Amino acid sequence: MPRFIAPDIRIHASFLDAMKEFVEEGADERSLLLHEMEEFGGTWHRPEVFAAYVERLNAEPLEETPRIEGWVPSTTLWYVEGETFLGRLAIRHRLNPFLRELGGHIGYAVRPTARRQGHATAMLAASLPVARAIGLASVLVTCDTTNVPSRKVIEAAGGVLEDQRGGKLRYWVGTDG
């Protein structure tokens, strides 16, 4: 049964396979995934680089962790079944101006070969108690106006549409279940 885990080096091979799928599909130019691919993609195959990447992801929730200027603390969770990487989800602990307009508190991605199986819906639902534990009573979740599957995922989680900005639909989702 799929579940969330903290990023873990044991998922290395499946993670690499998933990243190949995302590359073949073409990652969104504004996505965290693309940013990470540009930074690590050519070297993720090296165990020491992947271990450093995993260590960095697991340090991101800490306020004192060095990060790119303007970036906020975040909790990254990997959605796996056994040692198969199915997707990832990031919970940003607070909003900066960019996240308030376009990015939101929660971003998620399901690897292309695992889509249309209910994983995104399960991931978003399972992330809400985690967001609540971080101290977020409600979270902003956004999607492209043209991304009907993601819109349905957000609405299934109880998302209430606030408005549309910059090609994004902006929903608020309560974390109290």
Can you annotate each of these PLM segments?
Residues 131-142:
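Conserved GNAT acetyl-CoA-binding A-motif
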Residues 128, 146, 161:
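Ligand-binding pocket scaffold of soluble enzyme catalytic domains
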Residues 89, 115, 144:
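Mobile, glycine-rich extracellular loop/lid and propeptide segments
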Residues 142, 155, 160-174:
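Conserved catalytic-core motifs of GNAT/GCN5-like acyltransferases
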Residues 3, 107, 140-142:
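Short aromatic/hydrophobic contact patches that present stacked aromatics
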Residues 107-110, 116-133, 151-156:
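Conserved acetyl-CoA-binding loop-helix of GNAT-fold acetyltransferases
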Residues 141-149:
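Conserved beta-strand-loop-alpha-helix junction that forms the acyl-donor binding cleft
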Residues 1-105, 130, 166-177:
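GNAT-family acyltransferases
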